[in-house]
Structure formats: C-alpha cells, structure tokens
UniProtKB/Swiss-Prot annotation:
Ubiquitinated at Lys-754 by PPP1R11, leading to its degradation. Deubiquitinated by USP2. Residues 609-784 are cytoplasmic. It comes from Ovis aries. The keyword Phosphoprotein does not apply. Interacts with LY96, TLR1 and TLR6 (via extracellular domain). TLR2 seems to exist in heterodimers with either TLR1 or TLR6 before stimulation by the ligand. The heterodimers form bigger oligomers in response to their corresponding ligands as well as further heterotypic associations with other receptors such as CD14 and/or CD36. Binds MYD88 (via TIR domain). Interacts with TICAM1. Interacts with CNPY3. Interacts with ATG16L1. Interacts with PPP1R11. Interacts with TICAM2. Interacts with TIRAP. Its main location: membrane. The keyword Glycoprotein applies. Residues 525-579 form the LRRCT domain. The record marks 349 as: Interaction with bacterial lipopeptide. This is Toll-like receptor 2.
Length: 784
C-alpha cells in the first residue's frame, strides 16, 4: 500500500510540473518569423519548449527569478533577448553559452548583485547590453566586457548601490556608439578607467554630485563626441583650467539634463566651454538656475567667447528667483560667435535690444512657447538687432496682430523664414509689410478665417494648416510648397494662382473629389498629400484614381489615406479598392436600355394581344369580375323570363320569326328575353346581359358560325357558364342552328368548346318533318 501511494505522489508531482511548463509555453505568442512575445505574462520562470526557430524573445516585466544553463540552450538562432524588469537574482555561468548569434541582451532592473564575465564569453556578436538598475556595487572582479568586441551600446550602473569604477571595468572595449553610466552615488573613480575606450560617440552620465566629474572628463575629453550629464547638482562644481587646457579635445556637443546651477557654477561651466575648444553645441534641458544672474564681470572678462559654441539650446529652464534676475548684460560679449539659439518654454518675454545687437553671428533664433508680444518684440527686434538672422521662430507666444508683427520685423533685412504659428491672430488685414527677403512663412494654427494680399508675394513656402479657411484664391507667383491641411476647403486651389507649385499638402479638408485635369493644371507638381478628405467615390473619380499608375508617385499618402465617404455601400473602403456597379457608372445607358426593353416589351405585348385577342380577354375578365360581384342566385320572385336567348344578329330572323312564334304563342306560353326587345335603353350592355341572364331560368344559345364570331355572344356564354358551373344548375340550352366543326371554334371560345364536349344540345333539323319534335324537345328543356 505505501508503494502505491508513493507512485501516485510521484505521478502527481510530474503532472503538476508538466502542466506548469505547458501553461508557460502557451503563454508565449510567436509569429512565423520567430518573434515571441511574453511581455507582462506573470511568468516566474523562462518557458520550456523553446526551439531554434525563436529569433526574438521578450520576457520583460514578469516575475522570473532564475536563469538556468538549460533554459535557453536550444535557442541557437536567438538574436534578441529581453529579460528586463523581472526579479532575476541568479544567472548560471553557462546560461547564455549557446546564444552565439545574440546581438541584443537586456538584463536591466533585476536583482543581480554580482556580475560574471562568463555570462558573455561566447557572445562575440553582441551589440547591445543593458545592465542598468540592478543591485551590484561594482562591475565585477574581472574584466566584464573583454569578450565583446562588437559591442556598440552599453548601459551599466544603478541609482543607489553602484559606487565604484575601476580601471579594468571597460577593458576590451574600443569603440562604443552609446555608453550610459548610472552612478548617482559614485564614490570612487580610478583615473584612466574610461581611457581604454578609444572612441565614444555618446556618453550619458548620471551623477548626483560633481566631485568626480572633472576626473571623468579628463579621461574622455579626447575620445568623446557627445557628453550628456543628467540629474546632477552643480552647485559645488569648480573647473580647474590646469587640468584640461592643454589637452586636444574632441567633444562636439554637451547636454545638461535636469541639472541645477548657481550663478558661480554657471561661470565655471562657461569657462569649460572656453577651454574645451571643440564644443560646438550646448543644450540645457529641464534645468534649474538657483541664482539671480549675478555673473561676476571680472571673471567673465577673462573669457572672450563661449569657446567655439555655435548652437545653444535651452528648454524648460526654471529660475525660482525669476523676478530678481539681472539683465544678463555681463554675458552679452560672450555671444558673438553663436549662430543658432533655441530658448523654448522658458517664460521669455523679452530679448533686450543690446543683447540682440551683440548676436552678430546669429542665423537661427527659436523662442517657441514663451511670452513674447508685439510690445516686447519691438524692443527685441530693434535697429541693428540680429543683423544676419535668417530664421525666426515665435511659435505659441502672445502675438495678436499680424500687421504689427510684420511691421516690427522690417529691421531684419536678411530674414527669410518666419514661424509665427499657434498665435491667436484670428484675422488677416488686407495689406501688410514684411522683410524684403521673406521666402517661408508659417501661419498654422492661428485661427485665421481667410487669406488676403497681406501675404508677401516673395513666398516660396507657406504653411496655413489647421485654420478655418474655406477657400484659397491668392496669387503667389513664386510659391513652391503649400501646406493647407486641416481646413475647410472643398476643392483644390486654382492652379493659375500657383504656377510653380511643386508640393501641396491639403489633407483633412472637406474635398469630395479631384480630377486628372486639375492635377495636370499644376505643371510642376511632384508631391500631393490629399488624404483624410471625404471623397465621393463616383465612377469618374474611381476611374481616374484607379487607372492612373503614375498617380501613386505624386500622392505621398496613397493608398491608405484615401477613403470613400459615399456612396454608403463603399464608405470606409480605400479608393484604390472601391468598386461600383454597372448601373451606377453607366446610368444613362442603363436607363436607355431599360426604356428600350420596356418599349419592345410593350410592342411585343401589343402584337401578342392583337394576335391572340388579348384585348378581348381583358374585356371578358372585367365582365367576369362584374359577374362575380352579383349575387350568386336571384330569388325565385325576381325571375321574369323563362329563358334568355343568346343569338347572333345574323340569326335574328330565325329567332324572332320561328322561335318566338313557337314558344311565346304556345299554350301555355313561354316568356323569352330578347336583347332587341327587353334590354333597358341607356344601360350598359354588360349590365343588361348580366341582369337578363340572372332574371331568366334558362339561357338558350343559338349556335352558328355568326355566334362564334360575336363578342357579345361570348360574354353571354361566359355568364351562363358561370351559372352552370358555379351554381351547379342546368341553366344552359344549346341549339345548333347549323353544323359547326368543334375544331373550327376559336381558342378564345374555350367554354363553348367545353360545353359542347360535356353537354347534349338540340340540333335544328333541315328536314321539316322532324321540326315538330325539335320544338317539343325545346319546350321540355325549358320546363325542366
């Protein structure tokens, strides 16, 4: 018994592990190219069952704690492995040994307290390695990256426990495109630790304090192109001229991101610009200046320029003591070589005239998302301000008058590109003054409703997108590019107004269609973006859009941007894919064909009616319906005649001179109903026939060739037949006045043919000796 229990327990454990492995493997989603996604699946281990077909594996943001030697051994073709944001604390020595094709490895934000070079010894082609955010204090006891000759991007360190950088740490690395070191609590930097790297394109350095910054800078200044300093408090930074002045530097760009300055530390940074002579571009992003701009004039007098800095970018600069800030006149002389300045979202409301005049080399100025108005712009763009300025960006400021803005900028003789978008101009005056060399103007998102002659005729590029324009009727003879998207235009502009236009973006309007003729009218048009409009997919438009292969080379957002809005059955479909029926595309031809078919049908119907007595059948049907409306059987007291006599006019002599004499003068006499004598004058013939038959006990049909040719006799026969079959009585008496061949009876006399086949009839004898018997039989038939 215990043996059986032990066996059951073992099988249960195996079953649990098998089900767990199966569930984890099924939690991955893999596409045919071998890209497997296991991101955020609450996995606690690497799924089993991975094969050589897997080329990219994303297991980030899970709860994996351990990477074993066998977990990835079959993934020999794996190129990308993401294990970031897990709980990994242990990686076995040979976990990555079989991943010889691995190019991208992310182990960031786990719980690794020790790093081993054995992990990477077979990763010869690895290009990207991210080890950020783990718990290690150093980069290991041996050279961690010596087996990674092709590594181009490396990210190491953490914000708390990483405190030391040693000389061996980066041995074996010669060239890196990007190196990120997160060392907010760095306490030890061994000189020349970064010296072994011969070239670093971009170094991102997280330092909380600047104590070791200069030591690091000394090692990399000759091999670094771009230094980015993040999350650093530079209040205590001091630049030692002797440390760096004689070194041949290669740094081209310097970025300060989320860095704090004081007035004194800013002066030290400016000194750095001057001595690290290779710096061409400086960027301050989301920085804080804890000072009032009191830059000691004596200190700055020794610095003639901001080194060779040509581009200065300032974004989101915070100045807590903004209202105590100095006029910055002490730094004016340093700005003479600067060519490009961007000061964005920093509450700038004025550029002093004197500073503008000192910016003698400035070609590009961007003051976006600030507080500039016409009143302050007047002082900033004073006489001799920005003498060589070509591009001015005043996007999203507080400008309100287009006329005044243009007038204030007349001092900028070389200005050719002006961006005043996202200001609230609302309207445009009829005339304006602009600098004489204006070629580009951006008026997008300014809420203007119409365009006037205010725009300069020298424009080559105009952007008026995202406004309230419903038409474009300006003559701009030099305009090459027009951006007029997200307005209310219903059609393309007239090409005669824009003779040299080569680029037009007019998406997001209410244009229903455009034609080949319209596009051909723009002789130099090379790019048209017209998607996002409500196209009516008419036959002509679809024929043009789908039949012009060259159209795809002109329409930059073809085919996905072009959707049908009408007709309803193709709404939402791409214009390229929409199909209309033959009746929609050739309506006139279809209507003509239908009319012709109807005419032929009517003509054929007329011919058939004439040939087969169709009119006669319709009259008979009408009479039949009239008869149906009459009571089925008249009461006995309403019977006025013994018999109604139906005969042809050609047989009237026999009826009136023989039959009437024999029946009405017999004793007792029979009362006959004859149409000549008893029909009510003025009453419709059909009604007379119906009434007479219904008021007679019997109906006598005098059959002859003439009877067969008579339509009225046919009606009388039909109504009698109606009584005969619908009322189940013997009302009909047939008298064959002359021999009639049944086959000769016309088809329309179907009832006569039927009666002659089913009932007996009296035949008028040619032998006078038999006539007495004829009359006797007739009287008996009437009485029955």
């Amino acid at each position: 018994m215990p043996r059986a229990l032990w066996t059951a327990w073992v099988w249960a454990v195996i079953s649990v592990f098998t089900e767990g492995a199966s569930d984890q493997a099924s939690s991955l989603s893999c596409d045919p190219t071998g890209v497997c996604d296991g991101h955020s699946r609450s996995l606690n281990s690497i799924p089993s069952g991975l094969t050589a077909s897997v080329k990219s594996l994303d297991l980030s943001d899970n709860e994996i704690t351990y990477v074993g030697n066998r977990d990835l051994q079959r993934c020999v073709n794996l190129k990308t492995l993401r294990l970031g944001a897990n709980e990994i604390h242990t990686v076995e020595e040979d976990s990555f040994f079989h991943l010889r094709n691995l190019e991208y490895l992310d182990l960031s934000y786990n719980r690794l307290s020790n790093l081993s070079s054995s992990w990477f010894r077979s990763l010869y082609v690895l290009k990207f390695l991210n080890l950020l955010g783990n718990l290690y204090k150093t980069l290991g006891e041996t050279s961690l990256f010596s087996h990674l000759p092709n590594l181009r991007t490396l990210k190491v360190g953490n914000s708390n426990s990483f405190t030391q950088i040693h000389e061996k740490d980066f041995t074996g690395l010669t060239f890196l495109e990007e190196l990120e070191i997160s060392a907010q609590n760095l306490q030890l930097y061994v000189p020349k630790s970064l010296k072994s790297i011969q070239n670093i394109s971009h170094l991102i350095l997280h330092l909380r304090q600047p104590v070791l910054l200069l030591d690091i800078l000394i090692d990399i200044v000759s091999s670094l192109d771009y230094l980015e300093l993040r999350d650093t408090n530079l209040h205590t930074f001091y630049f030692s001229e002797a440390s760096i002045s004689e070194i041949n530097t290669s740094v081209k760009k310097l970025t300060f991101r989320n860095v704090q300055f004081t007035d004194d530390s800013f002066v030290e940074v400016v000194k750095l610009f001057n001595y690290v002579s290779g710096i061409l571009e400086v960027e301050f992003d989301d920085c804080t200046h804890d000072g009032v701009g009191d830059f000691t004039a004596l200190t700055l007098n020794r610095i003639r320029y901001l080194g060779n800095v040509e581009t200065l970018t300032i974004r989101k600069l915070h100045i807590p003591q903004f209202f105590l800030f100095y006029d910055l006149s002490s730094i004016y002389p340093l700005t003479g070589k600067v060519k490009r300045v961007t000061i964005e979202n920093s509450k700038v409301f004025l550029v002093p005239c004197l500073l503008s005049q000192h910016l003698k080399s400035l070609e590009y100025l961007d003051l976006s998302e600030n507080l500039m108005s016409e009143e302050t712009l007047k002082n900033s763009a004073c006489e001799h301000a920005w003498p060589v300025l070509q591009t001015l960006v005043l996007r999203q400021n507080r400008l309100k008058s287009l006329e005044k803005t243009g007038e204030l900028l007349l001092t900028l003789k070389n200005l050719n590109n002006l961006d005043i978008s996202k200001n609230n101009f609302l309207s445009m005056p009829e005339t304006c003054q602009w600098p004489g060399k204006m070629k580009q103007l951006n008026l997008s998102s300014t809420r203007i409703h119409s365009l006037t002659q205010c725009l300069p005729q020298t424009l080559e590029i105009l952007d008026v997108s995202n406004n309230n324009l419903d038409s474009f009727s300006l003559i701009l003879p030099q305009l090459k590019e027009l951006y007029i998207s997200r307005n209310k235009l219903k059609t393309l502009p007239d090409a005669s107004f824009l003779p040299v236009l080569s680029v037009m973006r007019i998406s997001g309007n209410i244009i229903n269609t455009f034609s080949k003729e319209q596009l051909d009218s723009f002789p130099q048009l090379k790019a048209l973006e017209a998607g996002g409009n409500n196209f009516i997919c008419s036959c002509d438009f679809l024929s043009f859009a789908q039949g012009q292969q060259a159209l795809a080379r002109v329409l930059v957002d073809w085919p996905d941007g072009y959707r049908c809005d009408a007709p309803s059955h193709v709404r939402g479909q791409r214009v390229q894919d929409a199909r209309l029926s033959l009746s929609e595309c050739h309506r006139a031809a279809v209507v003509s064909a239908v009319c012709c078919a109807l005419f032929l049908l009517l003509l054929l119907t007329g011919v058939l009616c004439h040939r087969f007595h169709g009119l006669w059948y319709m009259k008979m049907m009408w009479a039949w319906l009239q008869a149906k409306r009459k009571p089925r059987k008249a009461p006995r007291r309403d019977l006025c005649y013994d018999a109604f006599v139906s005969y042809s006019e050609r047989d009237s002599y026999w009826v009136e001179n023989l039959m009437v004499q024999e029946l009405e003068h017999f004793n007792p006499p029979f009362k006959l109903c004859l149409h000549k004598r008893d029909f009510v004058p003025g009453k419709w013939i059909i009604d007379n026939i119906i009434d007479s038959i219904e008021k007679s006990r019997k109906t006598i049909f005098v059959l002859s060739e003439s009877f067969v040719r008579s339509e009225w006799c046919k009606y009388e026969l039909d109504f009698s037949h109606f009584r005969l079959f619908d009322e189940n009585n013997d009302a009909a008496i047939l008298i064959l006045l002359e021999p009639i061949d049944k086959k000769a009876v016309p088809q329309r006399f179907c009832k006569l043919r039927k009666i002659m086949n089913t009932r007996t009839y009296l035949e008028w004898p040619t032998d006078e000796t038999h006539r007495e018997a004829f009359w006797l039989n007739l009287r008996a038939a009437i009485r029955s």
